Amino acid sequence: MPSSLKGLGQAWLSSSSMALSACCSVSAWQKRLPVLAWLPRYSLQWLKMDFIAGLSVGLTVIPQALAYAEVAGLPPQYGLYSAFTGCFVYVFLGTSRDVTLGPTAIMSLLVSFYTFHEPAYAVLLTFLSGCIQLAMGLLHLGFLLDFISCPVIKGFTSAAAIIIGFGQIKNLLGLHNIPRQFFLQVYHTFLSVGETRLGDAILGLVCMVLLLVLKLMRDRIPPVHPEMPLCVRLSCGLVWTTATARNALVVSFAALVAYSFEVTGYQPFILTGEIAKGLPPVRVPPFSVTMANGTVSFTRMVQDLGAGLAVVPLIGLLESIAVAKAFASQNDYHVDANQELLAIGLTNMLGSFVSSYPITGSFGRTAVNAQSGVCTPAGGLVTGALVLLSLDYLTSLFYYIPKAALAAVIIMAVVPLFDTKIFGMLWRVKRLDLLPLCATFLLCFWEVQYGILAGTLVSTLFLLHFVARPKTQVSEGPVLILQLASGLHFPAIETLRDIVLSRALEVTSPRPAVLECSHVCSIDYTVVLGLAGLLEDFRKQGVSLVFSGLQAPVLHTLLAADLKGFQNFPTLEKAEQYVRQELGMEPYNVCEDSVPEHKVTLLTA
């Protein structure tokens, strides 16, 4: 006994030391802290490119952050509070060199739905979303995102683009007292169109035209080559820089126009107004809030957030990982989806301590980052520093930014979110996928969570129907040969049973059958019971039911169940030959290039 205990202890120590060495290996540390993989190779060339990219993204995110705070129904400074935490956290934890985390149009829309325009609710939602996202990363639950199909995502983003864009019409036209619910918003906007402020409308339209022209200019800049004349390269660089920083330039132009009118004593525009100066205070997220009618407890706040605690973290993860994978594929590198969950989860958790609202990966700013030639996530340090500098020194200047200019920035940012091609593509490829797309798209105008839930439910029903009604290829002849074209799970066993019984036993002359199961990789207890029942039915009729091509795990399960009359053959030919011999028919010899002469039908039950 002592020797066995000693051996057991040595084995435990050996396995523990191996596990510890695996956890402490360089590759393990690099996986959890990706910065350790690229930092030792960092160069001056990378520093230059990262600085340019970080500056470009910073000039884009500052006006966008102010605008997205308006979409979220929060004071403008909360957009800037949300724009810098991700820059610093992602440098250490992110696996994509291109992704930039920060406020986005879609997340701002979700925040406006669930936080009642109350900053305390928004900050608490950030903290709880971060906890949920971090837990999903630690528990490797990222696969749950796979159940939200592409048509659902496209339906949601297209609806969000319309909701966000139309929601800014009131600021573009200078209208007041417009409700935030979409249908009421449409009604009251058209009802109040006669109250349009001419100054806001003209400035907003001019800003939109300028943004569009600058975007088209950037899209048409030819690739720069070293053999080009210096003046051509400089011109292309100047145009590209101007077009990339178009949001900042257009907002600055609008602010200068507004300031010029302010000096004369006449102001035709609605301005952003006072913004809290300085950096945000570092404090614990609010777990209760004092309202006009009393103090709201943490439990009550969680109840008020409701479905937002599921929708916001899931959509945040989905958007960020989709952006990361898209640019990783485009630029030929790999991202770790689970590590991305950890990065965005920790970003939101830490961001809640500086009054951030929930953030995610931004497609538009990530595109700017990639096109600027960023080499590592270190470009985010420059972006974050620029946002902090603007908070510390520029907030007094933000007073003069017209709301119409910010509305123009938002509208031009969300236009690409509406995917007009997806409807035609699905019509050509698989029309059934239009159902979850349209369900999501239409119901999102009522409530966002209903749209996402309906689309996901429809997609899941399609998936469950496919599992419960597997495609089955049946070969008719003296021997019924049934080939499962997909897996076999417990919802499908009754369908399989009905097909086999109706084709083999419920006929004038019962015949034997062969189940070809090479595509079945796993079964459960319900399937075992169903197959046992089939074997019993065949035995009562005096004919055989045999199996072929069972994979090792499935064969092991069926052998462990000790089914009476169970027989398995390695190939379909051998199984069919055995049954034919049992019937007293001539032996069936199959050469390599011969095919059994059966009438084949495809059943899609």
Swiss-Prot record:
Record-linked CDD domains: STAS_SulP_like_sulfate_transporter
Catalyzed reactions per annotation: hydrogencarbonate(in) + chloride(out) = hydrogencarbonate(out) + chloride(in); sulfate(in) + H(+)(in) = sulfate(out) + H(+)(out); oxalate(in) + chloride(out) = oxalate(out) + chloride(in)
Cellular component GO terms held in the UniProt record: apical plasma membrane; basolateral plasma membrane; endoplasmic reticulum; Golgi apparatus; lysosomal membrane; nucleoplasm; plasma membrane
The keyword Hydrolase is annotated on this UniProt entry: no
Topology, Cytoplasmic side: 72, 120-122, 168-196, 271-303, 362-373, 419-447
PROSITE patterns in alphabetical order: PROKAR_LIPOPROTEIN, SLC26A, STAS
Places the protein is found: Cell membrane; Lysosome membrane; Apical cell membrane; Basolateral cell membrane
UniProt cross-references to Gene3D superfamilies, sorted A to Z: STAS domain
Segments crossing the lipid bilayer: 51-71, 73-93, 99-119, 123-143, 147-167, 197-217, 250-270, 304-324, 341-361, 374-394, 398-418, 448-468
Molecular function (Gene Ontology), one example: secondary active sulfate transmembrane transporter activity
GO biological process per UniProt: oxalate transport; sulfate transmembrane transport
One Pfam family per UniProt: Sulfate_transp
Membrane topology annotation: Multi-pass membrane protein
Principal localisation: membrane
Keywords, alphabetical: Anion exchange, Cell membrane, Ion transport, Lysosome, Membrane, Transmembrane, Transmembrane helix, Transport
Stretches in topological domain Extracellular: 1-50, 94-98, 144-146, 218-249, 325-340, 395-397, 469-605
STAS domain ranges (all copies): 479-582
InterPro entries referenced in this protein's UniProt entry, alphabetically: S04_transporter_CS, SLC26A/SulP_dom, SLC26A/SulP_fam, STAS_dom, STAS_dom_sf
Recorded family membership: Belongs to the SLC26A/SulP transporter (TC 2.A.53) family.
Function description: Sodium-independent anion exchanger mediating bicarbonate, chloride, sulfate and oxalate transport. Exhibits sodium-independent sulfate anion transporter activity that may cooperate with SLC26A2 to mediate DIDS-sensitive sulfate uptake into high endothelial venules endothelial cells (HEVEC). In the kidney, mediates chloride-bicarbonate exchange, facilitating V-ATPase-mediated acid secretion. May function as a chloride channel, playing an important role in moderating chloride homeostasis and neuronal activity in the cerebellum.
Protein name, UniProt field: Sodium-independent sulfate anion transporter
Gene: Slc26a11
